[in-house]
Swiss-Prot record:
Gene3D superfamilies: 3.30.230.10
EC number(s) recorded for this UniProt protein: 3.1.26.5
Catalysed reactions, semicolon-separated: Endonucleolytic cleavage of RNA, removing 5'-extranucleotides from tRNA precursor
Family: Belongs to the RnpA family.
Quaternary structure (record): Consists of a catalytic RNA component (M1 or rnpB) and a protein subunit.
Gene Ontology cellular component list: ribonuclease P complex
Role noted for this protein: RNaseP catalyzes the removal of the 5'-leader sequence from pre-tRNA to produce the mature 5'-terminus. It can also cleave other RNA substrates such as 4.5S RNA. The protein component plays an auxiliary but essential role in vivo by binding to the 5'-leader sequence and broadening the substrate specificity of the ribozyme.
Entries under Pfam families matching the protein: Ribonuclease_P (PF00825)
Gene Ontology terms describing biological process: tRNA 5'-leader removal
Record's protein name: Ribonuclease P protein component
Molecular functions (GO terms): 3'-tRNA processing endoribonuclease activity; ribonuclease P activity; tRNA binding
Group of enzyme by EC: hydrolase
Length: 119
């Protein structure tokens, strides 16, 4: 899974207002219009992380980001082949257990896949 790097990419995903979430996370997603069909064998998923200072100090924020990266890679097969994802942490993510975050991300990614399949 590649990274969303530019501010423009983050803004594009966040402006679309398509999201799924749980108690501790919000998943914003964008599927490009020209990649709705899965005939193309290449996979192009990009991940961005948004962890604000309301989550905690730098050490806490970095811990949350590290957990998000690991969990996103573990569950990326649930996502459509071509999509941009921004995982946004709520302040409660700092105290959430790894198992809880794992379940929430799996459920949110499955919800994203379901919503994209319906569209």
């Amino acid at each position: 899974m590649e990274r969303l790097q530019s501010h423009r990419d983050f803004v594009t995903v966040l402006k679309r207002r398509r999201k799924a979430g749980g108690k501790d996370i919000v998943v914003h997603y964008l599927v490009p219009d020209d990649h709705h069909d899965d005939d193309d064998r290449t996979v192009h998923r990009r991940l961005g992380l948004a962890v604000s200072k309301s989550v905690g100090h730098a050490v806490t924020r970095n811990t949350v980001k590290r957990r998000f990266r690991v969990l996103a890679r573990a569950h990326e097969d649930l996502l459509p082949a071509h999509c941009d994802i921004v995982l946004r942490a709520k302040p409660s993510a700092a105290t959430a257990s790894f198992v809880s975050l794992d379940q929430q991300i799996a459920k949110a990614f499955a919800t994203v896949a379901h919503k994209v399949a319906e569209a």
